[in-house]
Amino acid sequence: MSDKRTNVGQQFDRLPATDGDRTVEGRASRAAVVDFFAERFGIDPAVFENFSFWEKGKGKIWIFAADAPSPIRVEGLGMTVLRTRQEHWKPTQSAIQRFGRHATKNVIELDGEAAATFACGEDQEIDWDGDWGYLIATHTVGGEREPIGVGLYV
């Protein structure tokens, strides 16, 4: 008999520190989430040092700027940051707008017209020399590069 627990969709469970600490099959670990943002977007793991990560449902990862007992049955805990139980992990719009300014790779700067098209959710063909997959779209506002969302480059 397996000692693995099952996912309970009505509660938040803190992510295990590492894959070796996992007690629910398929659940991401804190290390894997932090590594994803570091490897995909070049975000320094130290950015996430004071945050806890939680799963509610299957693969909906939340980030919380504090700690709480685990499990906990509440409607929301921080903000959603990542979807993991699919082939390619997808960061949320909120995560990109909050943490995207720390990214050093897979960031595409959009001019005014392209940024407006992006904001409307329309597909567009843009030249990109980097990797395919999810990119952080940015636009310069007031002289500063601001993340406006996440887009899929194929």
Regions found by a protein language model. Name each.
Residues 2-154:
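Polybasic, low-complexity RNA-engagement segments
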